[in-house]
Amino acid sequence: MKKTYHGSCHCGGIRFECELDLAEGTSKCNCSICTKTRFWKALVKAEAFRLLEGEYVLVDYQFGANAIHHLFCSRCGMKALGIGDMEELGGKFYAINIACLDDVMEEELAQAPVTYEDGRK
């Protein structure tokens, strides 16, 4: 069942909310940036994401095919989310850093299915 989660970066400069169901699955990728940042994500459709604060502190980083906008806080360095637009994933989406969800319960994290993606190919 979808639930509204609130999230933020470490310093609070970025604040967002999103509608997601962690039971539908999360993922971890082995591409270079996800490996180095230990990014554990949940994908959220564009209409289910709201940036509440922080557009002015977001820094965009892209590499490789420039398919994903990796967004970091310019103050604390936290990678809070990514933005992509891929037909195979249903169009525009937000990749939410699970670690940035402020009101997620430990039980929800323990029960969330994790898919491992091969992002190195």
Where are the regions a protein language model picked out?
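A short Gly-Trp-Pro
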Residues: 1-8, 13-121
